[in-house]
C-alpha cells in the first residue's frame, strides 16, 4: 500500500532525476528557487526570482548592503520594478523597494553545475523605464534568461535598478551627485561577484550585456574605476557611454525644473536636495514628462534624467576613461536602422506611404540635431546627407536618409568611436563589432525597413524558441546564431569558440580594416564586412567637430511655449541663409537618453 501511494519505485525515477541546487547559502541567508525539468533525460534549470542585492534604497541616496534575513528566502516570483511613470505618464507603478535580482542556472543529469560563465543583463528604457524581467508576451517575459542559459550553458542574471528622477536626478554638485541607478547596477555586479560561486558560477568570468540605455550602462560600468576586477567581458547592444543621450551635461537645469514642480527651493542646491529627498517619490517621478506629441526639437533633447560626470563613479568624460576597460573583452554593435524609432516620433510621416517628407522636414530635423554648431553645422550636415539625392530623390531614399541621420548621431558613430577607443587602449583584451540587419517583423512598417531599435532583443533572448508560434524557421536561425556568439564570447572571450557552433567566423576588430560582422538570417563567409559608413564617421569626427561651437553642449535650449518660431528652411543654392532655431530663449538640455522597450 505504501509503495503504491508513493508512485513508481525509485528505480523508475532514476532516469528522470536531475541535479538541482535546492537551498543555496548567500551572504544574506539561505535562498530557495524552483527547479524546472526540461526533458525526460534529466536536464533542468534552477530559477531564483527576487533575491535582494541591496537594502531598500533611500530616495536620492546611494544603495546600501542588505542586512540579510532569517530562515530560508523563497525566491519564486519576480519583484516589482523600480518606481516609474506608466507609459501614459499620468500615474506610477512599481516600488521604491526594488533592488532585487533573478538567476537562471542550467543543470545536467549527473552533478550540479560549477564554474559556469555568468552573464548579467542590464535593461534599456531611456534610463526612464524598464524592469529586470521586461515586458510579458504570451506569458513569457522578454528578459527570461532560460533560453540563453540552457542553449549556451551559462548562468544568466537580471536585476532592477532605479530609473527616472529617482535614479538620475542631480544638482551637478555634492548635494545630489546623481548616478544612483548606476550605483544600483554596480551593487548588483558586486553581489554577483561575491555570491555566484554558491550557485555554480565562476566569479572570475562575469560578462555584462545590455541594450540601449542598458548598453550605455554596460559601457559606463566598464569605464568606472569602481568595477576594477569585477568584469571580465562586456557586450553593448545599440548604446555606449559616448552616445549623445548617455550623459547629461546640464543636470542642474533639469533638477530645478523638478524642484519648481514639487515646490522645493531652487536657488540653493543644499536646500533643494534636502527638500527633494523628503518629497513623495511618486510626485518626483511624475514631475518629469517626456513630451510624446510634436516637439520643437528632436526627442533626443528631452531625455533628461541620465548619468552625469560626477567626478566619482564617472570621474571624467567617458571618452577619456578607456584605460579602465583595457582588460575587458568587448563587443559593441548597432542595428542598421536603430534611429527609426526616433525619426518615427520626430517626423511621423516617415512611416506613411501616403505622406511625403520634404527637404524642409529634413532640414528641420538636421537643425534640431546640430544645435551646438549652429547654422554652419546644420548646412554642412544637410549637404553631406542629401548628396545622394542628386541621383535619386524618391520618398524612399529621403526617408531612409532621415533614418540614417538619427542612426548615425544617436548610435552608430558613437559606437564606432567607442570600439576604436577600446581597441587602442586594450592590452590583452579582444574587441569585436557587429551590425544587426535582420529586417523588422512589424507589419505596419514600410517595406524598406531594416532592423529597428530593440529588434535584436527577441533573438538574443531566444523568443523564436520560447514562443515558436509567433516566429518562422529563419527567425530561429538568427536567434540560435546570436545566442551562440554571445555565450561563446562569455565563456572564452572569442565569439567563435566555446559551447556552440556558429554560422560564420567573426574576426576581431582592427583599426585598419574597421571590420564588423553583419548578423542576419543569411550568414556565411561573406558576413564579415569592412568600413561601415566611413565617410560619415570622418564627417562627424573631423569636419563637423572642427566647426565652431555656438552653444555649449550643456546649454539648455527651451522651446518657445507658443510654437510661433519660424521653421528652418534648407539652403536653396548655398546662398540663402536659412532661419536657425533660436537658441537664446529656448530650452532643451543637450543630447541625453534612449528607449529600449
Swiss-Prot record:
Broad enzyme group: hydrolase
Disulfide bridge partners, by residue number: 82-98, 264-275
GO molecular function ontology, one term from the record: retinyl-palmitate esterase activity
Chain positions carrying an annotated carbohydrate: 205, 379
Subcellular localization: Secreted
Free-text activity regulation comment from the record: Activated by bile salts such as sodium taurocholate.
GO cellular component, one term: membrane
Keyword Signal attached: yes
Pfam families: COesterase
GO biological process: one example: pancreatic juice secretion
CDD domains cross-referenced by the UniProt entry: Esterase_lipase
Described function: Catalyzes the hydrolysis of a wide range of substrates including cholesteryl esters, phospholipids, lysophospholipids, di- and tri-acylglycerols, and fatty acid esters of hydroxy fatty acids (FAHFA). Preferentially hydrolyzes FAHFAs with the ester bond further away from the carboxylate. Unsaturated FAHFAs are hydrolyzed more quickly than saturated FAHFAs. Has an essential role in the complete digestion of dietary lipids and their intestinal absorption, along with the absorption of fat-soluble vitamins.
Family designation: Belongs to the type-B carboxylesterase/lipase family.
SUBUNIT field: Interacts with CLC.
Name used for this protein in its record: Bile salt-activated lipase
